[in-house]
Amino acid sequence: VEAGSSSEALERELVKYLLKYGHCSFEFKEGRTMVPCNVAEVIFLELDSDGLAFRNPLYNSILATYREQWKILGTGVEVPAHFFLNHPDPEVCNASVDILTSDDNYVASQLWRRKDIHVESDAEMLAVGVPKAVTLYKSKVIEALIKELQGRLGDENISDEEMRDVVQRLTAYNQVKVTIANKIQRLIL
């Protein structure tokens, strides 16, 4: 996932983390301590804390199905793939198959192992990838909200009260954008 990824690509990435690794845990460094985190828990807490929902209805449906089963099964328990592969919506089935099989073509070469070249483990990849994907997604949502509000400022029929409200919200969103930008810098470095 790159900083220039679209919000839809980031939604897909977050769904991939849920479907493939939602039951897995990783350690995230906070200050000097390592904090154990569950992939699904981190994604749901981050989305819920800001009241975010996926804009792509297909990914939102997969997210809702996963969340429903996750609540029943509990944290750390793998949500069986059949909930997605046998979903009543054929588009959810197709997208799930595509996501679940997308990375299966990549296997570390035996040459790498013989030469002692470090191959990143799933846990190492999750510790960076999950927080980064969630943060980048939040950034894209904030950018879209700012753009929408800036469009409203250009409206000639906007009242003074609405104008003050829009400017106030723009200021708040820009502060969040700066916070996210700082966080992304830390995640990438």
Model feature map: region roles:
Residues 63-189:
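Bacterial replisome coupling helices
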Residues 1-82, 94-98, 102-110, 142-146:
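Non-catalytic protein-protein interaction segments used by genome-maintenance enzymes to assemble
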